Design a protein with these regions (language model features):
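Amphipathic, charged-and-aliphatic alpha-helical interface segments
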Residues: 225-243
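Short acidic-hydrophobic surface loop/beta-edge motif
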Residues: 124, 138, 168-170, 290-294
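Generic long, charged, amphipathic alpha-helical segments
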Residues: 205-229, 294-305
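Gly/Ser/Thr-rich helix-start
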Residues: 144, 220, 240, 244, ...
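Conserved "right-hand" nucleotidyltransferase catalytic core of DNA-directed polymerases
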Residues: 1-160, 176, 183-186, 229, ...
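Conserved ATP-utilizing enzyme core subdomain
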Residues: 281-300
Length: 305
């Protein structure tokens, strides 16, 4: 097929050369990074114990749940068979009101950074001071690449200390790193494949697509769209691409399910071609047992049959 001949086979040679070349790292920078993580982790540990009024194993969900929801009497605890849940979604809702929760979230993030990157990457540095990851071409269901041993496609960006790991990776002499990123590629592909005239016209205007959507969905003049309306429209724009439900959107925006459903319904009124396109995608997949990309890549979805 065209996908195999023109895309997959030529790409295999590119990936081989990338794996062979590897990426240059500075072991001393990685060591300093680990030291910085250790220092901040120790500070957080002390702070958490002081706020809790005593020492306990922060890494134990059982102990952590008992401290937060019994000893400290923080409301909102969810009891499970093994004790109180301290999952990320539970802590996310409590973090704005309780400083100890924010510290616990940061502690968890930094301990993961330490084990995965500060300690984990060191084991993969070769004699050439490079890390040679494996790029997996045919493992993911969607056709995207994945990276293993180690995973270099998931270098953290959200936390300040997470971003510092990037200093460990350096370009070769007389070279630089470059970053190229498509602008709103998912929405542009959706506009192309759905043929929705309103969305295509919005892109032709070369204005802020999320502000345009907010203006249309919330029936507000473009110049008067608030930052909150734009943020909500952005969540709907990208959520629709990935089949978000009214419940999922309500969780993302901290609004009621009814209000979220209203946003989605209004979105489909604004861009009717998208609704038609998405419905056809589902009906075709039910009939064929797979969906297909613009390039002919098929993804089986037997659960729809």
């Amino acid at each position: 097929s065209r996908l195999f001949r023109e895309l997959e086979m030529p790409l295999s040679y590119v990936l081989y050369s990338m794996e062979k070349e590897g990426i240059l790292v500075k072991p001393e920078e990685l060591h300093l990074y680990g030291e910085a993580l250790n220092g901040r982790i120790a500070e957080l540990e002390t702070s958490i114990h002081e706020q809790a009024g005593g020492e306990f194993n922060i890494n134990s969900p059982k102990q952590l749940g008992e401290v937060l929801f019994e000893k400290m009497q923080i409301p909102g605890g969810k009891k499970t068979k093994t004790g109180y849940s301290t999952a990320a979604d539970v802590l996310d809702k409590l973090a704005p009101q309780y400083p100890i929760i924010k510290d616990i979230q940061e502690y968890r993030g930094l301990t993961k950074l330490k084990s995965t990157y500060a300690d984990g990457l060191a084991a993969y540095i070769g004699e050439d001071s490079r890390i040679h990851t494996n790029f997996n071409q045919t493992i993911t269901a969607t056709g995207r690449l994945s990276s293993t041993e180690p995973n270099l496609q998931n270098i953290p960006m959200r936390m300040e200390l997470g971003r510092r790991i990037r200093k460990v990776f350096v370009p070769d002499e007389n070279c630089i790193f470059m970053d190229a990123d498509y602008s709103q590629i998912e929405l542009r592909v959706l506009a192309h494949m759905s043929g929705d005239e309103q969305l295509i016209e919005a892109y032709k205007m070369d204005e802020d697509i999320h502000r345009i959507t907010a203006s249309k969905v919330f029936h507000t003049p473009f110049e008067e769209v608030t930052d909150l309306q734009r943020r909500n429209a952005k969540a709907v724009n990208f959520g629709i691409v990935y089949g978000i439900s009214s419940f999922g959107l309500s969780q993302d925006l901290s609004i009621s399910t009814k209000e979220a459903k209203g946003y989605i319904d209004e979105y489909f009124k604004t861009y009717p071609g998208i609704k038609t396109f998405l419905d056809k995608l589902v009906s075709d997949a039910k009939e064929k047992g797979y969906c297909e990309s613009m390039f002919g890549r098929r993804r089986p979805v037997p659960e729809l049959k």
